[in-house]
A protein has these predicted regions:
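N-terminal localization/anchoring segments of enzymes in phospholipid and broader phosphate metabolism
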Residues: 1-351, 355, 359, 383, ...
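Glycine- and other small-residue-rich loops at beta-strand/loop junctions that grip anionic moieties
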Residues: 180, 370, 404
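Short glycine/threonine-rich loop-to-helix capping motif typified by GTGT followed
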Residues: 379, 405-409
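Catalytic-core elements of nucleic-acid end-processing and repair enzymes
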Residues: 433
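Helical hairpin unit composed of two closely spaced alpha helices linked by a short loop
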Residues: 370-392, 396, 401
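Active-site donor-binding acidic/aromatic loop of nucleotide-activated sugar
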Residues: 422-426
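Phosphate-/nucleic-acid-contacting segments
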Residues: 363
Length: 512
């Protein structure tokens, strides 16, 4: 036989779950379309009811205290499709998670607010602008800023992976992992081997993975297998196509915490393309950040809040605090990890990005795989370039989603005319999500510049202020630019049909 029986069984398990889910989703979509057209065909009262629903949704959005760009694009969509617009918003645009999820998560977060209290003196050495940004995150996150912390920036997944394995091998107390995508392969096999051994040694090993993000990557008995190995698991927000088509509120975070002393974040998931063991869209360019010291506590609390909302295990987080030597670690500027979620109306991630852009005096360089933003972000980038700031946007040269890439390119002309320099990473797909500005501030994390990351998903990131790795990120961007193609105005020309398609994509951007 060419394939061993276990390989065949594994392949069948993955395909079976994926195929069943896809079939159920298609069945539900078909049923909903049939029901919509059947109910609305010649049914004046049904049409009137849908119009009234759209009217109420419109009034609700006008009064709702949330990002104006997000509201406006939904108001336009509802105005153009009054029969369907209100229902689409309820299905795909409503940022509030399901009531049960919201109640569980908010209860845990309220219980542990004191665990994230800002300690005095952490930001005293910062300039006023940096101190103000840090204060915003600590008050509205709330995630405190920390001295006594160090960081290491990785310009790609294959640079990070050996250090990650080495840190996992050192674990003595606990290992927490939280990822959007976990997929079987070389990367996961290396991690899993260590997790199984550590769990057998009595280390507390826990894994949260997004059920939708990992749908095609894991066998249906994955949780059972992990639990047998004493690795506790939570598939976050399980996919239930016959219950809901909504794919919002995904756990897009990337977090590893080892013993409360070391943490990782960035754009890298646990799948082979992230360390270039598998080629999907050319070379996979990503970024990650390793943190040591007091700042790791923020990541620990982020993880435990998610964990205890769905699998209550402990009320006291104190046993998971960094050890004494970590709390007294060498200081390298200020590090402030933070999370963003759809549980509140605070657009934390977008506000941090806007602050960095608006405060920039010399330069701001941005890595992002997707660019689908509102007028506020667009105008901030244009205004920075117009006042003489060197604004550079680095995007993929080989996209993973063709329509999203076309949507991204629809923003090129206004940005280019304002003086923003745009680059496409020609060797492959750029998946990093990073900002760096003025040798002063940087962010590295999981947050894309699109509606889903900024408003609908659970995300995480780390802000670096006057940290040595700000320069490391800047240098990585400058090394990457020669590998890119700089976009010129002539590259942005399109036909009338293309312009119309771009307009439609802009209108539908919250759904993409």
């Amino acid at each position: 036989m060419f394939f061993r029986l276990p390989v065949v069984r594994f392949f069948n398990r993955v395909i079976n779950r994926a195929m069943v889910t896809v079939a159920l989703v298609l069945l539900q979509i078909g049923w909903l379309l049939w029901a919509f057209f059947s109910l609305t065909a010649g049914k004046v009262w049904v049409n009137a009811g849908l119009n009234v629903l759209s009217l109420f949704i419109t009034l609700y959005l006008v009064r709702k205290d949330e990002n104006s760009d997000y509201k406006i694009i939904w108001l336009v969509l509802i105005g153009m499709m009054p029969l369907l617009g209100g229902a689409l918003y309820l299905a795909f645009g409503n940022k509030a998670p399901a009531k049960r999820m919201r109640q569980r998560m908010q209860a845990v977060e309220r219980q542990h607010t004191a665990d994230l209290a800002q300690q005095p003196g952490q930001t005293d050495a910062l300039d006023p602008a940096s101190r103000g940004l840090s204060r915003y995150i600590s008050e509205y996150g709330p995630y405190p800023a920390w001295k006594n912390s160090t960081a290491k920036y990785y310009p790609c997944g294959e640079a990070m992976y050996p250090d990650l394995l080495a840190d996992l091998e050192k674990a003595e107390r606990f290992i927490f992992l939280e990822f959007f995508i976990v997929r079987t392969g070389k990367m996961w096999d290396g991690v899993e081997d260590i997790l199984v051994r550590k769990a057998a040694q009595g280390v507390d090993v826990r894994l949260i993975y997004d059920d939708f993000g990992s749908l095609l990557g894991l066998p249906s008995d994955f949780v059972v297998k992990m639990e047998r190995a004493h690795i506790r698991c939570i598939p976050f927000n399980p996919v239930m196509p016959l219950v809901s088509l909504v794919m919002n509120h995904r756990d897009h975070r990337k977090i590893v915490v080892v013993d409360g002393n070391t943490a990782y974040t960035g754009g890298i998931n646990l799948a082979d393309e992230y360390i270039n063991e598998e080629e999907r869209f050319g070379y996979w360019k990503d970024a990650a950040l390793r943190t040591e010291g007091a700042a790791v506590w923020n990541f620990t609390v982020m993880f435990l809040d998610h964990w205890n909302a769905f699998r209550p295990s402990e009320e006291d987080y104190a046993p998971f605090m960094p050890q004494a030597e970590a709390l007294s670690a060498q200081s390298d500027g200020v590090i402030q990890p933070y999370g963003d979620s759809p549980l509140d109306e605070e657009a934390l991630a977008e506000t941090v990005y806007l602050n960095i852009i608006n405060q920039a005096q010399r330069y701001v360089y941005i890595y992002t795989p997707y660019f689908a933003v509102g007028e506020t972000m667009l105008e901030a980038l244009k205004a920075a370039a117009k006042r003489g700031v060197d604004v550079r946007l680095v995007l993929p040269g080989i996209p993973d989603k063709k329509l999203v890439f076309r949507l991204t390119r629809s923003y090129y002309v206004p940005l280019f005319r304002a003086g923003v320099r745009i680059y496409e990473f020609t060797p492959g797909f750029l998946h990093a999500k990073c900002y760096v500005s003025d040798d002063r501030a940087a962010v590295v994390g999981s947050i894309n510049m699109d509606y889903r990351s900024l408003f609908l998903h659970f995300e995480c990131e780390a802000l670096l202020l006057y940290n040595s790795q700000v320069i490391a990120l800047r240098d990585d961007v400058l090394r990457t630019l020669p590998e890119c193609r700089e976009v010129q105005l002539a590259d942005c020309r399109t036909s009338l049909a293309g312009t119309l398609l771009d307009s439609v994509l802009r209108l539908l951007s919250p759904l993409m």
